Amino acid sequence: MEANRIEEKIYKYGADILASEGMQKEKTFVQHGSITCYDHSLRVAEKSLELAEKCSAYIDERSLVRGALLHDYFLYDWHEKDGGHRLHGFFHAERALHNARRDFNLNFIERDIIRKHMFPLNIIPPKFRESWIVTWADKLCAAEETTRVLRLAFTKTARG
């Protein structure tokens, strides 16, 4: 899918989310390396649409995009060393779901995407195709974002 069509779909289905106070707050939190939670969520939505296009089955693109944008809607800096976020990987999906339900009307698919995107770290598997797609898109984006940081650090170390 070409970049313009992906961007159009993200804004078609998620403009209210992107403009929300919570998503604006996500711009202040780092997710992986120098990537903000906001940018990570956008990347996951983009990657989800790319993966969905490869599926021969019907995909609810609206739920896919909205769930992807909100999958990390936990709204805190998990890098803070206060001890309160030590098990972030295990618990942030429920926090994200709580915040998303407070701020938006979510359908079953969107709720499942947010709650289960950390599978298999969280042991209950996704129920819907859309949830599986966002789960994989999140893993792919996180790996890319994290390895970019490691690659840069390794390059700087190697150069002395």
Residue ranges of model-derived segments:
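Metal-dependent phosphohydrolase cores
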Residues: 1-160
